[in-house]
Design a protein with these regions (language model features):
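Alpha-helical transmembrane segments of multi-pass inner-membrane proteins
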Residues: 1-23, 39-43, 89, 116-127, ...
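N-terminal signal-anchor transmembrane segment
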Residues: 7-95, 124-128
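Membrane-interface helix caps and helix-loop-helix hairpins in membrane proteins
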Residues: 27, 74, 128-137, 249-251
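Membrane-interface micro-motifs in multi-pass membrane enzymes
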Residues: 29-33, 75-84, 138-142, 202-216, ...
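Membrane-interface helix-loop-helix junctions at transmembrane boundaries of multi-pass membrane enzymes
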Residues: 47, 51-53, 94-114, 224-239, ...
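Cytoplasmic-side transmembrane-helix entry/capping segments in multi-pass membrane proteins
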Residues: 59-61, 106-116, 168-172
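Membrane-interface helix termini and inter-helical loops of multi-pass transporters
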Residues: 70-71, 130-135, 190-201
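Aromatic-anchored transmembrane helix interface
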Residues: 81-87, 110-121, 132-156, 175, ...
Length: 271
């Protein structure tokens, strides 16, 4: 009986043997889209055998993902995260329903039960909807966002406290990249309030969602900056905090500013 590591190594070898000729043929016939096949197969392999790696990649890529609706006006699809979310959801549901690999504390948690009720109600209303296909698509979208971001991450967080720090670092690093991109574009227009509504495009649709994400992750950057750690990690976290501070101010999102003031007030109450 082969172990998981042996099976995964065998599949990696098969992927390599299949993709090498494809790359050669794509060069010979100048069919450049074939170069997308190797990373696509690697993503499938990673999702099947290392669900944690796949989830960390999704977390890392989320702040810099691009929505095709914004660029083409077609079907809404965020790349590269959304196809992976679908794969992770499929594997996670199999592990939850058939293999029982998820912590029962997550499955039976009151928030989880509330989610089950919410999705069941969505299914009922989708069936009775005037446009059932549209409603079912909306339900499917909800499922492939909720399962990875709630159930899979909760499983990883319960598995190890280090995973919580991994999540914060991965998300904040690319959020800082997105903030730098926005600041550079914004600087070309003199940091005016009028242009602040769209300079974060295509990473964020407009400044409201951009400011909301900055405000939500600002306390995390603050925590990483002042937690007991090596000076190198604290210095990097401090640099990210400075960039996110500037980005939050120049987002001209009053709701984000007020939420940070409110969060600070709550912190002082419990200090």
């Amino acid at each position: 009986m082969l172990g998981i590591s042996q099976i995964s190594n065998r599949w990696l070898a098969i992927i390599g043997l299949v993709t090498l000729p494809l790359v050669g043929l794509s060069v010979a016939y100048e069919f450049w889209y074939a170069f997308l096949v190797p990373p696509a197969l690697l993503v499938v392999w990673m999702t099947l055998y290392r669900l944690d790696w796949a989830m960390w990649f999704i977390v890392f890529a989320t702040p810099i993902s691009i929505n095709l609706t914004d660029l083409t006006g077609g079907a809404g699809l965020s790349l590269p995260t959304e196809p992976m979310l679908v794969l992770v959801t499929f594997i996670a549901l199999i592990k939850m329903a058939l293999l029982g690999e998820f912590d029962q504390r997550i499955i039976k948690h009151p928030i989880s039960i509330a989610i089950y009720v919410y999705l069941t109600w969505m299914l009922f209303t989708a069936i009775t909807s005037q446009l059932p296909l549209v409603s079912l698509k909306q339900l499917a979208t909800r499922i492939w966002f909720i399962v990875p971001y709630y159930f899979v991450l909760a499983h990883l967080f319960l598995k190890s406290d280090r995973n919580k720090l991994t999540f914060l670092w991965l998300f904040l690093i690319t959020l800082t990249v997105a903030a730098i991109y926005t600041l550079v574009i914004h600087s070309q227009y003199g940091f005016t309030k009028k242009t602040s509504t769209w300079v974060m495009f295509p990473l964020f649709k407009e400044h409201t969602s951009y400011g909301a994400v900055l405000a939500m992750m600002y306390p995390a950057a603050l925590y990483l900056t002042f937690r007991k750690s090596s000076w190198g990690f604290n210095a990097v976290a401090g640099a990210m905090l400075a960039i996110l501070t500037l980005a939050t101010v120049l987002s001209y999102t009053r709701a984000a500013w007020l939420s940070l003031v409110g969060a600070g007030a709550v912190y002082l109450v419990y200090l």
